């Protein structure tokens, strides 16, 4: 069956559904890498700037959207900056299991399904629940790559269903005012 549109799962409804020991057939998290670029702490000490992709609304982001955004940012940075010149981390983890009450839409389907009887739904995917102000992507880089980092995060944000903003600041200035916003 095809994947439902993101608008079906964008809003948070009800409590999180995360307990895998009670969920039979819960899909695996299909994001192979959460850390990209230069991952060693010694090499990351040379990166003085930090960029963050921050979500502006509360909602859910499916794992397909997170993976598409990760691939867009990773491919752009690998091509134009080089893997040795940045560190990129995906912060949002899709723990919430999405359910779907599949409805058949063909001739004779009324004899095959139960309609709204026992309509709890079966596991259909996963999503990350995010709050306003939460960081989706975190990146460290050198000052000469500011334009490329902004473009990579902008491209990643086009794959996400919620509005986002880019915050660039000096490393270690976590609570201070942002240097640049895009």
UniProtKB/Swiss-Prot annotation:
Q: Name one GO molecular function term.
A: structural constituent of ribosome
The alphabetized UniProt keywords are: Ribonucleoprotein, Ribosomal protein
Task: Spell out the SUPFAM superfamilies in the cross-references.
Answer: Ribosomal protein L16p/L10e
Top-rank taxon of the source lineage equals Archaea
- What's any one GO cellular component for it? ribosome
Single biological process term from Gene Ontology: translation
Q: Which PROSITE patterns match?
A: RIBOSOMAL_L10E
Tell me one Pfam family matched here: Ribosomal_L16
Task: Establish whether keyword Ribonucleoprotein is in the entry.
Answer: yes
Looking up InterPro entries in the UniProt record yields: Ribosomal_uL16 (IPR047873), Ribosomal_uL16_arc (IPR022981), Ribosomal_uL16_CS_euk_arc (IPR018255), Ribosomal_uL16_dom (IPR016180), Ribosomal_uL16_euk_arch (IPR001197), Ribosomal_uL16_sf (IPR036920)
Family classification: Belongs to the universal ribosomal protein uL16 family.
Known NCBIfam families for this protein?
PRK04199.1-1, PRK04199.1-4
Write the protein's name. Answer: Large ribosomal subunit protein uL16
State which gene encodes it.
rpl10e
